[in-house]
């Protein structure tokens, strides 16, 4: 289903941290249950408090005056000379899912990052959905992840610049993501690679 009402995208600010937390909690609780809703809402609150336009970037999607989506972009710091960001989490209002908002907000993010001379945008999610936004499967031997991945098939890259890749170091992620449980989980758990994220596109 395509979006009939125009959706506007813009950078968000740290003073919206509480409303951002409630937004993520509502979306994930409805789609994935209370436990996942609590995990992602706490994560989104911590990220929102750190928004500075450099290490943590927040982007919001709005229809008229209503917020319908949020994404976070956080810096992955490698020792090599590459400017790399990480995409997660992503959420679209449950009443506006499957209308292309998730894809469009990611496209907005990619255009913004290109202007900032960013080289790569990484994510850890379902390839069948993120490939719709230009992401491609990669390997941790080519682009190392911050922690060991339980689902390495979900380690995805979107090359923004034409710079040749040669990365050997393990990246340092922002503080809220320094938790190996967010990267390694059982099949019965949702984690960052939750299959229900297709609802956002």
Predicted features, each with a name:
Residues 6-22:
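A short beta-loop-alpha structural element at the N-terminal edge
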Residues 17, 21-64, 68, 72:
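Active-site rim helix/loop that mediates acceptor-substrate recognition in acyltransferases
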Residues 27, 112, 129:
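Short alpha-helical functional segments enriched in proximate histidine and acidic residues
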Residues 77-84:
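A short, polar/charged loop-to-alpha-helix boundary motif
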Residues 89-97:
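A short, internal acetyl-CoA/4′-phosphopantetheine-binding micro-motif in the GNAT/acyltransferase core
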Residues 96, 100-108, 118:
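Conserved acetyl-CoA pyrophosphate-binding loop and the N-cap/start of the following alpha-helix
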Residues 115-119, 125-150:
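Conserved active-site alpha-helix within GNAT-family acetyltransferase domains
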Residues 145-194, 200:
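C-terminal "cap" of GNAT-fold acetyltransferases
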């Amino acid at each position: 289903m395509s979006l009939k009402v125009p959706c506007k995208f813009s950078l968000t600010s740290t003073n919206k941290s509480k409303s951002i937390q409630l937004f993520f909690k509502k979306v994930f609780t409805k789609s994935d249950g209370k436990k996942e809703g609590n995990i992602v809402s706490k994560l989104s609150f911590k990220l929102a408090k750190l928004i500075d336009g450099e290490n943590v970037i927040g982007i919001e999607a709005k229809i008229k005056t209503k917020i319908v989506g949020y994404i976070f972009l956080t810096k992955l710091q490698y020792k090599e000379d590459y400017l790399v960001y990480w995409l997660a989490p992503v959420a679209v209002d449950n009443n506006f899912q499957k209308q292309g908002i998730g894809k469009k907000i990611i496209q907005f993010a990619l255009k913004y990052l290109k202007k900032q001379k960013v080289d790569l945008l990484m994510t850890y999610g379902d390839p069948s959905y993120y490939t719709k936004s230009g992401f491609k499967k990669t390997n941790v031997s080519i682009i190392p992840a911050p922690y060991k991945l339980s689902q390495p098939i979900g380690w995805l890259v979107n090359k923004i610049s034409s710079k040749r890749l040669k990365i050997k170091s393990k990246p340092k992620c922002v503080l809220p993501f320094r938790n190996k449980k967010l990267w390694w989980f059982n099949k019965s758990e949702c984690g960052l690679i939750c299959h229900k994220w297709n609802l956002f596109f």
